[in-house]
């Protein structure tokens, strides 16, 4: 999240993370960076490398999407890098045969997470967040009276077989106050 401190209406001030239940977990990687590479042909996977020595690819699953590849259309360069916090992957195949993937929720504080703690109400699929959970890049608490910008990134680097990559699905953001 970001407060427009300089008042220019642009997201060019300091970004803050909203801490969640796994922020301080031993398995959480702070200062994580992953770089994605534009595929050179339609139907090809999106390759990635990270700053932990890892690499892999986002599989192209034509049965679920009809775009040429999963590299974002709004990115004009052949690579783009995301920086932030990486959570431990919790997904697993309960069948042992690759046919029944489970993605358990995190305790609280993450988008597209079905924790009862995060829900706006008992019947909603919406998640709620509090800017009182804002932290800086070093994990220190930050007091923000309000925010002007929201950026949402998937905090997990994992695949779930035929479901594909674990990714955040967000349909909108609104103020609950």
Predicted regions and their residues:
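Extended interaction regions within the primary functional domain
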Residues: 19-23, 137, 167
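Short beta-strand-plus-loop segments that form exposed binding edges in beta-rich domains
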Residues: 152-159
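Extracellular Ig-like/FN3 beta-sandwich strand-entry sites
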Residues: 144-149
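Generic detector of ordered, mature protein regions
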Residues: 28-31, 138, 160-165
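A Trp-anchored, charged/polar loop motif used as the substrate-binding/catalytic surface
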Residues: 121-141
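Internal, well-ordered interaction modules that form the hydrophobic cores of assembly/scaffold domains
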Residues: 2-7, 15, 21-24, 150
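Aromatic, loop-rich ligand-recognition surfaces of beta-strand-rich domains
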Residues: 1-12, 160-177
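Low-complexity, serine/threonine/proline-enriched polar segments
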Residues: 10-13, 21-122
């Amino acid at each position: 999240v970001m407060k427009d401190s300089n008042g220019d209406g642009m997201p060019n001030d300091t970004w803050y993370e909203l801490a969640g239940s796994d922020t301080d977990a031993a398995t959480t990687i702070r200062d994580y960076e992953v770089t994605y590479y534009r595929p050179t042909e339609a139907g090809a996977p999106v390759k990635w490398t990270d700053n932990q020595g890892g690499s892999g690819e986002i599989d192209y699953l034509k049965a679920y999407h009809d775009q040429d590849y999963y590299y974002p259309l709004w990115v004009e360069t052949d690579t783009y890098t995301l920086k932030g916090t990486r959570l431990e992957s919790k997904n697993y195949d309960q069948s042992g045969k690759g046919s029944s993937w489970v993605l358990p929720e995190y305790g609280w504080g993450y988008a597209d997470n079905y924790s009862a703690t995060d829900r706006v109400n008992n019947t909603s699929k919406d998640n709620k967040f509090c800017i009182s959970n804002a932290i800086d890049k070093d994990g220190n608490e930050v007091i923000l009276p309000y925010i002007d910008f929201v950026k949402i990134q998937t905090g997990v680097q994992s695949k779930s077989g035929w479901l594909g990559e674990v990714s955040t699905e967000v349909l909108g953001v609104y103020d609950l106050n």
